[in-house]
From Swiss-Prot:
Family matches, as InterPro entries: AceGlu_kinase-like_sf, Asp/Glu/Uridylate_kinase, G5K_ProB, Glu/AcGlu_kinase, Glu_5kinase, Glu_5kinase/COase_Synthase, Glutamate_5-kinase_CS, PUA
Function: Catalyzes the transfer of a phosphate group to glutamate to form L-glutamate 5-phosphate.
Originating species: Roseobacter denitrificans (strain ATCC 33942 / OCh 114)
Protein name in UniProt: Glutamate 5-kinase
Any GO molecular function: glutamate 5-kinase activity
GO terms for biological process, alphabetical: L-proline biosynthetic process
Positions of the PUA domain: 278-355
Amino acid sequence: MAALTDADCLVVKIGSALLVDRDAGGLRQAWLASLAQDVAWLTRQGVKVVLVSSGSIALGRGILKLSDTDLPLEQAQAAAAVGQIRLARAYEEVLAPHGITTGQVLMTLDDSSNRRRYLNSRATLKQLLSMGVVPIVNENDTIATDEIRFGDNDRLAAQIAVTVGADQLVLLSDVDGFYSANPNIDPTAQRFDEIGEITPEIEDMAGDACSGLSKGGMKTKLMAAKIATAAGCRMAITEGVVLNPLRALNEGAAATWFRADTDPQAARKGWIAAMKPKGTVHLDSGALAALRSGKSLLPAGVSHITGHFQRGDPVAIADGAGHTVGHGLVRYTAEEAGRIMGRKSNEIESVLGYPARAALIHRDDMALTIQNGD
């Protein structure tokens, strides 16, 4: 078991069935207040926390007095629009007394599959966390359609964990872990304390969702575990219905942990290094020295650009002799990079005509093959 207090960044997924009283259609206020206590406790330990919360459609359904059956797309989107305001306010009200500022972030599948938007969402989330803000993330159900939606917040939570480089992900569920069979119908079902590899046999054990409010079942949780662990993030499934569920997990409550065999930073750098570059950014000796010391690549250190690339595309990074020294995800198009190369960061806006980021390639989006002293 991993201690939550050991995490640098923790992502917590909260399902509709935990947050919303199915019969009354309102929030489970006492439970939400206890969750806020847990978040405050973790932030005091120096842990950065991101909450991925369902509940907007379930809340809006109750406010609009819609049926509790599957809703047509238009009604679901209307319910999300109404419920999202209530959901954001609820988190603000329970966390503010602990001195915690919240920020709302709405995502769609496009925001992770499109590299440019992925980099933008990553930068925003990282900035919020650096300022001590607890982001409240939800799928943007008001505009998402079947073609551009995650479909469940288990996978969204895993993608957010990858995006922010979290080292732990907790899925608060209506069961206390992953079982060999459905424990509600099979008395011989056994819970796994830890799973090191998601094999075909493990996948065959997963069932489907049975809750009237939640869309996520064990199959989606396994998908989330694959996404998270491949990026170096450990993941836990634990029962969330109890009060103070995060503190309970930290103190040894029943759960299933999915092991990650690498750390988030190493996994991300391996992912970047494996991409086929769309172009090359050539550096001067000063920029090369800066990269060796762990700095981001600024336009001032670029001598010339080759290839055709868009924002978010992978590029090779080369020294003055043309030798590849790394790879990175670039924050500018080839045309923009050509205009600002050799320029100081405070000149970028005047050259491009609009505000822009200081780094051409941020150090978090870079995988180098050189080391200090090379």
